[in-house]
From Swiss-Prot:
Domain Malonyl-CoA:ACP transacylase (MAT) per the UniProt entry, residue ranges: 934-1244
Catalysed conversion reaction: holo-[ACP] + 8 malonyl-CoA + 8 H(+) = atrochrysone carboxyl-[ACP] + 8 CO2 + 8 CoA + 2 H2O
Domain Starter acyltransferase (SAT): start-end pairs: 35-262
SMART domains: PKS_AT, PKS_KS, PKS_PP
Biological source species: Aspergillus chevalieri
Protein name as annotated: Atrochrysone carboxylic acid synthase
Pathway field: Secondary metabolite biosynthesis
């Protein structure tokens, strides 16, 4: 072999050279060391051939992986190179075990061989006087070396050896798995045992005896695979190997060991033929002629002679055939080597071993025992390589490669909301600048053309996206709150990324290049307007993740679960194109296989305008006037753009539409410019040259340059100078073809960070349209500075009208895109148009296809349907197969989905119209797909040609059938292929029973494999009669080989022992009972109970004929089955014994999925139920299909949601299942007699997809992909709503200025009481009024009242204080409106959300605000009041208490109450009687308030109860009100509380309550009213009976009646109490100026100053309903800045949500914090979809604790995935 040192100089004729390639794979540690070494050497420029070999081998491996079905491909982790693949040690235990070992062996041996020869100091390993010897997989590497006369030859030969190693491993695994499936658990089992001290004859004789005695089927028989001096190796399926050794007296006691051969069977002609070898090497990419010359002979391990092949392909085929079928006879190899050494008369043999040379021990001994001893020098090259230190690396230059752009999308000014609308704008030459819109800021207040107003803009112009607030939050799983706080740049990056991915036909993990772990996201962004100005006005939860730049790409990664790199880049104006370059570099470096890149810019901050104006960047006269004589600066613009990119070879392999390719891209810096913002022509020209040189493209071949072209005199002139210098020079070599230039900024302004991506998308559209749009920047005349650059000699042109874009060189258009940065950076990209795509026009002959449309909402679903219909109306020539391929294999699918089968585009349009009209009927599919049951048909469904279309058009299906047919023949059975292929159907006789039964079995096994490739695998299986055999295979009970063996043997035994056609079978449409009643004692047997009214009977033909006559006479339908025997009848008896004996040789495994047994009428899970006797019984006994399904249904294995797939040639079982399980929603066939297979499948696949099953649609279309084209269909129809935080005021102008403090205004009303201190607003209009006041809890009177009601040693405003406030405001407003005294006042629906807790130490004001609205036009007239906290002078947007006052007639109330007085008085009398009898507790005053101290410490003024009687939850009290005067009150709390707080005494003092562990507090009442005023010193009686609220655990309510002299004069209606753990008391009631204590059950939650202590959310409205007239619904109080509130849920939803108050509170909180509608919180709504992310979870967990009193972890929203699961959790845990 020629090496850096010529072999002629180094070969020693006194040596005989032997190179040995071992079959032993090194240890994992050594493999890692070898791989690391090869990786390091490949990066060294001194090992170029190694690098090329590794690259070629990687590509070869990728080519093979692309051929794999998805279920196999998913097992392989993404990899950058073949070295990464070899590191995947875990693959060795699965279907890729043999492949990975073979690939690793070849890789290490060949890589080491190449690197060894690339070192100039090493002697060549081979020579003309040498021989190659190898064992096992080492033969593949040796074969490559054999024909590599030059080292570069080994690149191609070696990479093909890698391919063959991979393919052979897969073939061996497939063949071996048909013989015996691998164990699901436990260590791998050996397929080979080696015996020493036994001769080959002894072993062969013993094997023949044992194979026969154990009745092993031919394919599974044990055989001799290798013979060497002193040892014999036998091979076979592991279970049979063990059985044979245990059963053999000779072998059991011999000396033997199992070999580490775990990946299947080789060296046997039982399992393989020459066709297997031919198929394995068929994929090789080697010339058929002899372009390679044999360099060194390779010895066969079968006979020791050199392989006689004359071409590498022939040699590889011979090697593969030997590995698969040949017995290793190493003694012949040793003999040949001995003879060759002797012939050369050399004294020395040099053995270079690539791997452990243990196998050469016999050769060494033979040559040394010769009469003239020969010295043998052995060197392990692999071991020596590891021992040699790595040289200092000489780095290799980066590798250039074409990058394909396969998708794009944009949102650009001028209404460019799509790629097409952007092109329309360009084509028309529009200039879309306009005045700054109001949604950004008020241009009139923020614009000053004179520049006198600080911080104001000097220009009112810009180019803007139409309504950037629009966004589909639900699609991207964002809550409305998160969407509102998220920068619209980030939101539109998500939107355009999705649209670009759609155009690219992206489906996660569809191909190796779309593996989500290998997808990266890159976006350029140079400003933070929305975060700084809009969201910064009111900083919320999502201020950081919604506005920080890193979250723009990060959010895309997170949403799509992309595991690749994520970068946000800021290079000022060049951010987006520089980002695209970084993304390309990532692809070139192999760090990702697909990237999404783009740029974003949305302008909302006036500061940017002001700063750029002051920096002299901006024009004040309109848009960018690029190249115009009057160019005076640029015009700012919005812009969002995204592109999807892959390496070109991946895009071609993925059948993508390629928009253009990137040949080269680079960035440099204008470091030598006069200032940082000034351009530099030399730097720009240098960059262009570098880009062109890297790509190897002549600059004169470029026909279009998209310039940066901002419209500044200096910038445009400098760029034009650099462009003409390189692309249109004036030197001796000039352009012969025109160069056009353009600049998109003249249309849509300067998008800054998005400028580059806008320019790139423009050029991509030019490629698509093959046209150059007109330039619109020159408004007056060409700038005089630029005229010299546009000399005719340069042949450079500006298009002023639409111009065809013609190719310049080799029919290829090259374009350059420039994007420069104000910070000095220059980025340039070279583009080439996409390669021509070749489509096979006649490759897809399917008649019927599935078309699907889906969305995440009904609105979007309808929009998608309408858009697709419009597309088809505009494009009637659309190919149906392309449409099906695009909508299924190249689309992501969502939960609102429609799928249907169609045979024409007209049919599709008809279906679309139907579904548009009925889209409301579509229900979203469940998040968890339904279980799938497979039913396997029996013999009665047979017909010739079944499965023929699948067999002819799906290679994987054909392979399965072919291999199964091979197994049939290996077992000695006839071939099934003539039946499948339907060869000679017209002349052929009816197939023999064995053929029909084998065909059905093999077909159903192959169909199961095919369904698995489509992503559909059974969770349970059932088979009818013959169908039970493929069912057992599908469940993993039987291997494919054993299944075929049993079916064939059963057929042979029946043929041997039973008379053909002597018996018959008949299906009867009747139950077993009805048949019995009809036939009486007439002879027949029940064979199958298929359905309640479907039974099969059998017997002698005459008996069946007689039975038929009787049954039909009774009106029963009968059908004679066309079967050769009466299965499941006594006719089977003669064959049963022999069949059972045969079946006993088969290995039965535990089911991997449950097996529904029609024999047992039960479900089988274990390994002991199915055995040889079971197979005997299943042959003879009835098939009870009904009983089996009932048993499965009873234990929950199947239910009405289970989807049934009938895996058979014709739907027979579908009707049986429907009759047994009428509620089943979906049953689909696979094939149907007299119908094209694809038509049947189309209908079934459409149904399965509609049910929510995840289908591998790419596998459906894979056989036809070469003839299919990805359509550019309309993008997703968004369900958009506006999410926008409007910038308010002019604070960006005034920031930094000293703000004068406002002077407190005088009160606007004279109203002042102890509870209301300052009226801020009082407006009366007709019969309505609004009122705003503030009160100070530290006011002496109010503080005394609150401090007299102490809880947890804190003063807490009692509900009676809120009552006085309501009485006061209601009375005052009524008088103001009517100038008359107020009538009766009823305070209804008092709801206190948080307790008002007084400060403990601080003497500062503790303010709260009161807002009221009175409306006397309603009936009844009302005043609505809300209470708000005030912190640092700012009123909270959320109220903490509310009430509705209703005005009524006190006399009417008294009249109503008189009817109740006798009932209340009778209950009081009853309590008094019980007290006298000792049955009720009598509580004197001190005792009563001592019990109150369990929770509340009342001041003396409140202690009005003089005595009380209590029995469980019923009580009465005698009350005397205080005579102490204190303050100005309307209804003093010292009066209201004593007559009402008897209810609190019952709840917190009764023996019936657990007051040790719990306390009870009231969040409010339904009504409080007094028909007569309470008076100082007055004597009253109170009565109450508290009862639990039905359906609301932990809640009680009751009516407190207030009596005076036996007359009811007041009522507290439905005062409600709720139970809480006592441990939460410190959490709920702590002063705002004291940190809350830590507590085991209630972790501390920080409290805002002046905020009231949290009290649980009030009981729902249901708890407050009473017999009183209904109150008006609460009306929100006015607020200066109204907070966004959730709309109330519909009535039905409201009722469902209010069943439990805790759950109601939780849902209210979730809705409020997420800005969702309550109606959206349905039980099946997923929190991830609603946008409840980790941040929102933290907020909600805190709110749950502080406001609901329930402590949950923030992870609860991941553990409970849906609203329904959370409600269940709360109910079970806290209620």
């Amino acid at each position: 072999m020629d090496t850096p040192s010529s072999s002629a100089d180094v070969v020693n004729d006194h040596h005989y050279r032997l190179v040995y390639f071992s079959n032993e794979l090194p240890s994992d540690e050594q493999i890692g060391a070898h791989l690391r070494r090869l990786q390091a050497l490949s990066k060294d420029r001194r090992h170029p051939i190694l690098k090329v070999f590794l690259d070629d081998a990687t590509e070869v491996l990728r080519e093979e992986l692309r051929k794999l079905p998805s279920h196999l491909l998913s097992l392989i982790a993404p990899f950058e190179s073949i070295i990464d693949f070899a590191y995947q040690f875990g693959l060795r235990t699965g279907p890729f075990g043999g492949s990975t070992e073979g690939v690793s062996t070849c890789l290490i041996q060949l890589g080491t061989y190449i690197s060894y020869h690339e070192c100039p100091t090493n002697e060549p390993l081979t020579s003309p006087h040498g021989t190659l010897v190898a064992l096992g997989s080492g033969l593949l590497a040796a074969a490559a070396v054999s024909f590599a006369s030059r080292l570069p030859d080994l690149v191609k030969l070696g990479s093909e050896a890698i391919r063959i190693a991979f393919r052979m491993g897969l073939r061996v695994d497939q063949a071996s798995q048909r013989l015996e499936t691998r164990r699901a658990e436990g260590p791998a089992e050996s397929w080979a045992y080696v015996f020493s001290e036994l001769s080959e004859d002894e072993v062969q004789k013993e094997l023949a005896t044992m194979n026969a005695s154990l009745n092993f089927p031919a394919p599974s028989q044990i055989f001799v695979s290798a013979v060497s001096p002193g040892s014999v190796t036998i091979s076979g399926p592991p279970s049979r190997l063990k059985t044979l050794v245990r059963s053999s007296e000779l072998l059991r006691y011999a000396k033997w060991a199992s070999l580490p051969i775990f990946n299947g069977l080789c060296h046997t002609s039982h399992a393989y033929t020459h066709a297997d070898a031919e198929d394995i090497v068929s994929a090789m990419d080697l010339p058929t002629n002899s372009s390679y010359i044999p360099h060194a002979p390779l010895l066969s391990t079968r006979n020791g002679q050199p392989f006689a092949a004359h071409t590498p392909a022939q040699l590889f085929e011979d090697v593969i055939f030997e590995l698969l079928t040949g017995t290793i006879r190493w003694d012949t190899v040793t003999a040949t080597l001995h003879d060759r050494v002797a012939l050369h008369f050399v004294p020395e043999v040099v053995v270079k071993a690539l791997g452990a040379p243990n196998a050469l021990k016999g050769f060494n001994e033979a040559v040394q025992a010769h009469a003239d001893p020969v010295r043998v020098i052995t060197e392990d090259v692999l071991a020596q390589s590891l021992a040699t230190p790595l040289p200092v690396r000489a780095p290799r230059d980066p590798k250039d490669s074409k990058i394909a752009i396969v998708g794009m999308s944009c949102r650009l000014p001028g209404g460019a909301v799509s790629n097409q609308s952007f092109w329309d704008l360009l084509e028309k030459g529009l200039d879309v600048h306009r005045r700054i819109p109001a949604d950004r800021f008020d241009v009139d207040t923020h614009w000053d053309p004179t520049g006198q107003n600080p911080n104001a803009s000097k220009t009112p112009f810009g180019c803007f996206i139409d309504d950037p607030a629009l966004f589909d939050a639900g699609f991207f799983n964002m809550s409305p709150r998160e969407a509102e706080q998220t920068d619209p740049m980030h939101r539109l990056a998500l939107v355009t990324a999705h649209e670009a991915l759609e155009q690219a036909g992206f489906v996660p993990n569809r191909t190796p290049s779309t593996n989500i772990e290998r997808v990266g996201v890159f976006y350029g962004q140079a400003s933070d307007d929305y975060r700084e100005v809009n969201a910064g006005q009111e900083i919320g939860t999502y201020y950081i993740p919604g506005g920080n730049r890193a979250f723009a790409p990060g959010r895309i990664n997170y949403f799509y679960k992309f595991g690749g790199p994520s970068f946000s880049c800021d290079t000022a104006c060049s951010s987006s194109l520089a980002t695209v370059q970084i993304a390309c570099t990532t692809l070139w470096s192999g760090d990702a296989d697909m990237v999404i890149a783009g740029g974003v810019n949305v302008l909302t901050n006036s500061d940017g305008f002001a700063g750029l104006c002051n920096g002299h960047f901006l024009t004040q006269t309109g848009n960018c006037k690029t190249w115009d004589a009057g160019a005076d600066g640029y015009c700012r613009a919005d812009g969002i753009g995204s592109v999807v990119m892959k390496r070109l070879e991946d895009a071609i392999a993925d059948n993508d539409n390629i928009l253009a390719t990137v040949l080269s891209a680079a960035t440099n810096q204008s470091a030598k410019a006069v200032s940082i913002t000034h351009p530099h022509a030399g730097a720009q020209a240098s960059l262009y040259k570098r880009v062109m040189d890297r790509a190897g493209v002549d600059p004169l071949d470029v026909s279009y340059v998209e310039l940066h072209g901002t419209g500044t005199q200096a910038g445009d002139a400098t760029e034009m100078e650099s462009v003409t210098q390189v692309f249109a020079p004036m030197g001796p070599r000039r352009r012969t073809e025109p160069l056009h230039i353009g600049a998109v900024k003249s249309n849509i302004g300067h998008g800054e960070a998005a400028a580059g991506i806008a320019a790139l998308i423009k050029v991509l559209l030019m490629y698509k349209k093959r046209s150059i749009p007109p330039h619109t920047g020159i408004k007056t005349e060409l700038s005089p500075v630029l005229k010299k650059f546009l000399d005719k000699k340069r042949n450079i042109h500006i298009a002023f009208e639409q111009t065809p874009w013609k190719p310049v060189y080799n029919d290829t258009r090259y374009a350059v895109v420039n994007n420069f940065s104000a910070a000095g950076g220059n980025t340039t990209m070279l583009l080439e148009e996409a390669p021509v795509k070749e489509i096979q026009d006649d490759g897809d002959d399917r008649e019927k296809h599935v078309v699907a449309v889906s969305a995440k909402s009904k609105v979007s679903l309808k929009g998608n349907l309408e858009a697709l219909l419009a597309y088809l109306e505009e494009n009637p020539e659309t190919s149906l197969s392309d449409l099906a391929y695009t909508t299924l294999a190249r689309r992501m699918h969502y939960n609102h989905r429609i799928a249907f089968s169609a045979s024409s585009i007209d049919h599709v349009k008809k279906q679309l119209r139907y579904h548009i009209d009925s889209e409301e009927q579509v229900r979203p599919v469940p998040s968890n797909p339904p279980a799938v049951a497979f039913a396997f048909t029996g013999q009665g469904a047979f017909y010739p040609g079944m499965g023929a279309q699948l067999y002819n058009s799906v290679p994987s299906f054909r392979d399965h059938i072919t291999h199964l047919d091979s197994l049939c023949q290996q077992h000695g059975f006839p071939s099934i292929l003539p039946v499948i292929e339907n060869i000679g159907a017209e002349t052929q006789e009816e197939p023999a029973p064995i053929v029909t039964q084998l065909t059905i079995t093999c077909l159903e096994i192959a169909l199961t494999k095919y369904w698995a490739s489509l992503g559909i695998t059974p969770s349970v299986v059932v088979g009818a009669s013959l169908g039970e055999y493929p069912a057992l295979h599908a469940a993993g009970v039987l291997s494919a080989s054993d299944t075929i063996f049993l079916v064939g043997q059963r057929a042979q035994q029946l043929e041997k022992h039973c008379q053909l056609r002597s018996h018959g079978m008949m299906a009867v449409r009747a139950s077993v009972e009805q048949i019995t009643e009809c036939l009486g004692d007439q002879p027949y047997e029940v064979a199958c109970i298929n359905a309640p009214q479907d039974t099969v009977i059998d017997g002698l033909q005459a008996d069946i004929a007689s039975a038929r006559e009787k049954l039909q006479a009774q009106g029963y339908k009968c059908h004679q089955l066309d079967v050769p025997y009466a299965f499941h009848s006594s006719q089977m008896d003669p064959a049963l014994d022999s069949y059972e004996q045969i079946a006993s040789s088969v290995t039965f495994h535990a089911p991997q999925v449950p097996v529904i047994s029609p024999l047992l009428s039960d479900v089988v899970f274990d390994a002991k139920s199915i055995h040889a006797q079971y197979m005997r019984r299943a042959t003879r006994e009835p098939v009870n299909f009904v009983g089996a399904l009932q048993a499965a249904q009873e234990i929950g294995i199947i239910d009405h949601n289970t989807v049934w797939v009938e895996a058979g040639p014709h739907p027979v079982l579908v009707s049986f299942i429907r009759n047994c399980l009428p509620e089943v929603k979906r049953l689909v066939p696979t094939l149907r007699r007299n119908e094209n297979n694809w038509n049947t499948l189309a209908d079934s696949l459409a149904g399965l997809h509609s049910d929510g099953l995840t289908l591998q649609w790419n596998e459906v279309h894979r056989p036809f992909e070469a003839s299919l084209r990805l359509l550019d269909l309309p993008s997703y129809s968004w369900n958009e709503k506006r999410y926008w935080i409007q910038y308010r005021g002019t604070w960006t102008l005034t920031k930094g200025k000293e703000v004068s403090q406002p002077v407190p205004s005088s009160a606007v009303s004279t109203l002042t009481t102890s509870s209301i201190h300052q009226v801020l607003q009082e407006d009366v209009t007709g019969s309505t009024a609004t009122f705003v006041a503030r009160s100070n809890l530290m006011h002496p009177d109010l503080f005394e009242a609150a401090n007299g009601h102490r809880m947890n040693d804190c003063g807490v405003a009692t509900s009676s204080i809120h009552g006085d406030i309501a009485f006061t405001i209601a009375d005052h407003l009524y008088k103001k409106i009517t100038n008359t005294s107020a009538p009766g006042i009823n305070i209804t629906n008092l709801i206190v959300l948080q307790g008002l807790v007084a400060q403990k130490f601080s003497k500062a004001d503790q303010l709260f605000e009161l807002r009221a609205t009175a409306d006397l036009t309603t009936s009844p007239a009302t005043t609505t009041i809300h209470w708000y906290n005030v912190t640092d002078g700012i009123t909270s947007p959320e109220h903490f208490a509310s009430a509705v006052v209703e005005y009524g007639d006190a006399n009417v109330w008294l009249s109503q109450w008189r009817r109740l007085s006798h009932l209340v008085n009778s209950r009081i009398a009853s309590l008094e009687r019980m007290a006298t009898e000792g049955k009720a507790a009598v509580l004197p005053r001190n005792m009563a308030y001592r019990l109150f101290n369990n929770l509340v410490d009342y001041a003396d003024k409140y202690r009005g109860i003089q005595s009380a009687i209590m029995h469980e939850y019923e009580a009465m009290a005698n009350v005397t009100l205080t005579t102490q005067g204190s303050g100005t009150w309307t209804v003093p709390p010292y009066f209201t509380d004593p007559v009402a707080h008897l209810a609190g005494l019952v709840m917190n003092g009764s023996d019936a309550s657990n007051t040790i562990d719990y306390f009870y507090v009231t969040p409010g009442w339904a009504g409080l009213r007094f028909a007569k005023p309470l008076v100082k010193g007055g004597k009253y009686q109170s009565y109450v009976q508290m009862t639990p609220i039905e359906g609301q655990a932990g809640f009680w309510n009751g009516d407190v009646y207030v009596l005076q002299d036996g007359e009811i004069i007041g009522l507290v209606e439905k005062i409600t109490f709720r139970r809480f753990p006592r441990s939460l008391l410190p959490t709920f009631f702590s002063p705002p100026d004291v940190a809350k204590p830590l507590h085991a059950a209630a972790p501390a939650v920080p409290v805002k100053p002046a905020a009231p202590a949290p009290v649980p959310v009030s009981a729902p409205a249901e708890a407050f309903k009473s017999a009183a007239p209904k109150t008006a619904a609460p009306v929100p109080a006015p607020a200066p800045v109204p907070a966004k509130r959730a709309e109330p849920a519909p009535a039905a939803a409201q009722a469902a949500a209010t069943q439990n108050p805790t759950i109601t509170g939780a849902l209210d909180l979730i809705a409020k914090e997420s800005a969702l509608e309550l109606s959206q919180l349905t039980d099946d709504a997923a929190f991830a979809t609603l946008g409840v992310d980790s941040l929102m979870s933290l907020v909600l967990a805190e709110k749950f604790t502080s406001q609901l009193g329930i402590e949950v972890k923030s992870s609860i929203f991941m553990e409970c995935e849906t609203v329904g699961e959370l409600k269940t959790y709360i109910e079970e845990t806290f209620c």
